[in-house]
Amino acid sequence: GFGVSACATCDGFFFKEKVVAVVGGGNAAVEEAMFLTKFASKVKLIHRRDTLRAEKLLQKKLMENKKIEIIWDSAVEEVIGDSEPKNVKAIKIKNLKTNKIEEMKIDGLFIAIGHDPATALFKEQLEMDKEGYLLTKPDSTETNIPGVYAAGDVKDKTFRQAVTAAGMGCMAALEAEKFLSH
């Protein structure tokens, strides 16, 4: 809140004609940055390396977008804001090659440095993809173990929204009720 977010879809519209920064270099960061150009006057993508990890097609679209500036080899050191009203007014970024720290005026900061599902507990018990997300049967929330269901951020690597998690939770509850009644 108060100008720091992990969800451009949720909070992007608060930054109409403002300057925002996105931290990250993968698909999520590039997609967030491109989405934010619908609202923000300028989007600064801050990445700690000198190359992006995002898919090549996404990188091409990003590079073609005139509203996006990429700040390479850098990391956010500090978020600077006001207390009344609470909001972001700048960040301090450190160039990881030169160690030089600069202050950059922004109105919002979006964190998109990856999402790891909290599934380590289920390793070697439930089937997972290579990123650790639980796998379910097609059009279902049922896992490889009958009576065990997956919903929300442990299964959904695309949207990661409360509303989609709630919908999946409802599906899982209905499937569990059906399983228990048979």
Task: Give the residues covered by each predicted segment.
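A Rossmann-like FAD-binding core segment of flavoenzymes
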Residues: 38-138, 145, 178-182
